[in-house]
Regions:
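N-terminal intrinsically disordered, cationic/polar leader segments
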Residues: 1-53, 57-108
Length: 108
């Protein structure tokens, strides 16, 4: 994957995550505020102040996620972002992390 392909893919992934969180917020399933700064998306859970931070790491061609449960790295393989340690998929993992931190069962 070229640098441009990675940057385009990372941008569309972050946009999709932000849109999904905004949709869940609009549907009153979870109370979050998303803040975007360049390649970093910060999701704050209003009820408890906890955060999930997602950013792209162009030199590594990875997406990184920081949450209360820890830090996670994802590489794009076979059309999805896969955790480099446990093989979990990014959106499934974010659903579980956001459910735990937000106190509601949600699916991105």
């Amino acid at each position: 994957m070229s640098d441009k392909e990675f940057l385009d893919l990372a941008e569309s992934t972050i946009n999709a995550i932000e849109a999904a969180m905004d949709r869940l917020n609009d549907e009153d399933l979870i109370d979050v505020e998303c803040k975007r700064s360049g390649n970093v998306l910060e999701i704050e859970f209003i009820d408890n102040g906890s955060k999930i931070i997602i950013n792209s790491q162009a030199p590594m061609k990875e997406m990184w996620v920081a949450a209360k449960a820890g830090g996670f790295h994802y590489k794009h393989q076979g059309g999805v972002w896969i955790n480099t340690r446990d093989g979990s998929e990014l959106f499934a993992a974010l659903s579980a992390l956001a459910s735990a931190q937000g106190g509601a069962d949600i699916t991105l």
